[in-house]
Each structure stands twice: as structure tokens, then as C-alpha cells.
């Protein structure tokens, strides 16, 4: 077994952000002598929100993403951010799976379809992604492109569809490429409740041209006529704009929604055998290829433009590879975070990894029991520290986040104080058993319990979080040369303190210099 230069105990506090605002700040106003000492002694604030953790810019962090980044030692970009960056940097044209789809179309019958929700709602799809795909496919020289327009009206206003259709018409005219072939509401195209009779309406339209026939120059007037009869974007019955734009034998179809749940049924019918459940009279085309924007379901046989990324050699795996044992502990509410998410989004327990689940209190809301099971989690961790069995011990403390979500300020103060007491007990055990204690948080919460208007604030925040190290041999540097410090730097810092070399997959940086 490899030897660790130092043993490390990593504590991840849930929902502990840094803010100088005193009003409604359950962290600043609580008695936290232990965290105060650790922060003054040797610490640095780090970023835990937005692009720093792979989320869209300005979006508050969350527990899942926080633990994923902490454990991975790299920024783990969410699907939407990966797509947005490809669109912004104009690199879609280099996407391996898009190039393969284009080659298939070119070598085959020359026909490609883009199918999806056309709006700027940003929940399931974005019109900018559609524009970028049209541009990329034109650059890749796909001869014929057909666009199947799914009306929104749910994540956007109910009659905004004509505006999005006009934008698409203008874009296609400007590019002199692509043809809008079908318009149908998401009610029929994007069902997720196995209401196959709805999906059949869309299926019959896309393949068989079943619907009201008109031309592109009259399409907006047709939709406005539907609005007058209270048939809004979501519920638009199929409008067929060209016979050529039906899906035919040998066609290639890209569905450009990035959210999976409402794409599963329609793609399973178009790209797999599920169409048999529709009892449609329309003959299913042969040799069609479906591609998703993302992986809609692990069991689906067709490719995705942005498949899930595998996170090889996350901290837990790397310690295991190096023959080092480890211990992960949390109460029920956060157990998945110290196992599945901390381990890179995999359920698998690595070799020499021990886990411990402490049951969360059975109460209606956690403001009724602010300390939650923090004392019991500390007990389990201290037990391990005394055994000196594992060179890496980690745990999560849930109270600041879970009680923070209740919006009850006084309870949040108690939750913060209970967490500080628990960390204090662990700190004493670390000193006695020669462990270096490192403390961080996955995102902010309890430091903002009050909104500007005085009402309860129950959400996460975009504030910085602490990162502390109890050994003065490893002093935090002032800054990184090219970016702000963030959660992705926690695992590399832990490895540096343990004296374990970093895997090449970790792009985070150690934030301490050895004295």
C-alpha cells in the first residue's frame, strides 16, 4: 500500500457561504469560534457558483454540483454549459458526432432533419442552439436540411411562437439554407406520460404529413388563426409546410432539445421500435438514424452530440488506485453527496473505500431539530480518526443548508452553531491523531436568510465559501495566475497535502505552498 505523507480529514459543510451583510446572516451572527479560528489561521475563500463549477453564468451552486466539483478536482461542466460554450466559441462544426451525422447524410440520401422546441425558454432547448446547428450543417455541406418546429408556449408566453417562427424564417433566408417543414405543439411532440395518442399526432405529421397543409409564407397567418380559436403554441395541431420535408427512408434526424425527459418518447418512436405502440397506419421509414443533443436515456441505442462525460480518476478513485484507504460519512440527507456525487457521479464504491450513513432525524421540517445529526456524524468521524486506519477521512455537515432552506433564521443560527461544535470536536481529534483538518463548503445558504424586502430567503447563494487548512506547513497562496480559486481546486490541494501526485485528468490546482 502506498504511504501518505500526511493524513487528511476533509469536512464539507453544506450551505456555508461568506458574506459581510449582518442582517439575516445566520453564520456571521452565530457563535462559531472553531471556524473563526480556522479561517483566521490559514484559509482562502473560493468560488462555488456559475461557470466556476460548470453551471450557467451567475447561477447559484447546489449540493450535487458542489460535491461533484470538490471530488473531481476539475470543473464539471453541465450539458447546457458545454453546449453554450460550443455555440459561443463556434466549435459545433468540430463536434465529432455532428460530423459523423453529416457524413452519414452526405454519403446516403443527402437529407438531414433538425427537430425540437423552438423558443428562447431555455428549459428544454434554445433557439440559438438551432441557429448554430443550421450554420454548422451548412459548413459541413449537408445538401438538404429540413426543420421540424415544435411550438413552446409553456416556458414562453402562449402566443410567442409566431415571433420565434419569424426569427427562424429570417435566419433561414439569410443563410439561404434549410427549409421549415412542420409546425406542431409540444403537447403532441414532447409528451412524457406515455400518452402515446399524443405522440402519434406528431409522428403521423413528421412521417406521413398528416395535418393542415399550407406554405411557409402563409404559416404565420395560419397560426394566428389558431390563436383566435384559443389554440396556442403548446397545443398547435400539425401544420405541414412541404411534402419533401417528411422523414423518409435513410434520413438522419437530430433532436436538439438538451433536456431529456420530454425527448424520450418521440425519439424512441422515431429511432427505435417503440413506434409499434402507436398503432399508426403510417409506414415507418427504413434505415433512419436518430441523434440526440444529449443522452436522453442510457439504454437508448442512438448517439448524442454531447454524450455524458466520464470523470476518470476523481479523488476517491485516485486514492484507491494508489492503494490508499478512505472513509466517507454523512447523514441521510447528504449521503448521496459524499458517495455518488463526490465519486464523480458513479454509484460504485471504490476498493478500500468505507462508507457510513447516519440517519437524519425524523421531523417534519429541520427547523424543529436544527443540529440534525451533526453530533452523530462527528462521533463516527472521530471514531475513525482514533483508529488511524484511513489516510483520508471525509464527511458532510447538512444543518446550515437544510435548516437554511426552512427560512427560519433563529433555527439556522442554531444549525450553524451545532455544526461549528461538531467541527471543533473533529479538530481536537485531528490534533490528537496527527490528521490535517481541511474544511470547505459546497455552496452558500445560511449566510442569507433574509431577502432585501425583509421576507424569508430560502435559496442557495452565489457567495464565496471558505477553504481552510489546519497545518501551517501548507500556507494558502494569495491567488492563481489565470483564474479565481474554486471548488475544483479542493481535491488537488488535498492530494498535495497528502503527498500524492495528481492524476493528469485533474485540471484544478493545489492552492497551498509547502513551507
From Swiss-Prot:
Catalytic-site annotation from UniProt: 63
Record: residues binding substrate: 124, 154-155, 186, 192, 259-262, 334
Nucleotide-binding recorded as keyword: no
GO terms (BP aspect): glucose catabolic process; glycolytic process
Keyword GTP-binding annotated: no
Record's GO cellular component terms: cytoplasm
Catalysed reactions, as listed in the record: (2R)-2-phosphoglycerate = (2R)-3-phosphoglycerate
UniProt name for this protein: 2,3-bisphosphoglycerate-independent phosphoglycerate mutase
E.C. number: 5.4.2.12
Binding site for Mn(2+) 1: 401, 405, 460
Keywords on record: Glycolysis, Isomerase, Magnesium, Manganese, Metal-binding
Function: Catalyzes the interconversion of 2-phosphoglycerate and 3-phosphoglycerate.
Cofactor(s) required for function per UniProt: Mg(2+); Mn(2+)
